[in-house]
């Protein structure tokens, strides 16, 4: 009785080597990055492209499980960031709030602004407002993240808890900390934009192209 349980906890359903779990974890986090940059950022916030409904809903579903974020909140906060960039009203500017605050407390700044009903009401236009958004994704973000935890443990065993923790930390670290913080504080500039946005790296691979933040704020 005990041996099967120990065996399951040691490897889960997939029973992979540690390096295979590492590669899969990085792959899963990249799906999250792609979901944020293509769906939330380019499609929803800036209306730069239209996605097939099936593709758009896959991104919504994945983000519900991998981040617990609500589309209208992310979009509204990002639009306000562009509208009020580097001012005291910017939700996450290191120019007004300090680089240490944005880098280490970026997720807290996001959650605080998500509770600002005026921000959401003013900047949420055009975001999904269907039944599943109102009754599932918007109301039960914790259920999505809990579902991801269960899936990770089933697939990877006890190591799935670590996989899940990395997934949950990925956007707070890369987006809230690195892009919103470092991307307005340190790096190089291809263009003289009216804000402090910088390019962190010329290769937009790790964070889905968001590393080229000066380019984005200019165009």
Language-model segments: which ranges?
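Non-catalytic, topology-defining segments of multipass membrane proteins
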Residues: 1-178, 182
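Active-site-proximal inter-transmembrane loops
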Residues: 124-131, 186-212, 216-219
